[in-house]
């Protein structure tokens, strides 16, 4: 077995950029909550989560948590699959939640084009000047943009949680939402601290298993989406 000589260390992580992006994301809280309030005031019968690739898996915890802690009708679709079958539960009484980091994810753009024709409300986390953002804005749908580039999935998780949990709160299913959302203000410092604390263990595991014939990722519940993403 070849000796491991390269060491990827935490100082390569751009801490200041990470914290700055975290502030931007948290600063979107009010805008996201307003979107939640609007769809609740307008009324809806079900929520559909729509994504492909990483977005599909990032939305998975929301489906799990909403199903576990509320009686809201929620389902999730791979955008390519949805474009094939046009699910009948997407109607004028549906709230569709989607996202596109690039702003022009082909399958998501295609899906929203026929979804808006059903009269469904759409909330998209994407670039306002991207193809998806421009289209949905023209159609009077909700577009929320957070211009961040570091941190992986966790920025998306915070935004998705604000939306889903505020909707649950409005429906009487999450009475401590404000306490939760206030507490999220320090989450990025906590996540950075976890990185620091885990760095040595991660290096040890990498040295021990980097050349293993195969790896098994274990997860369930709210963690299953991210576990699947690791494998995919």
Annotate each predicted stretch with a short phrase.
Residues 40-186, 220:
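Glycine-rich phosphate-binding loops that contact phosphosugars or nucleotide phosphates
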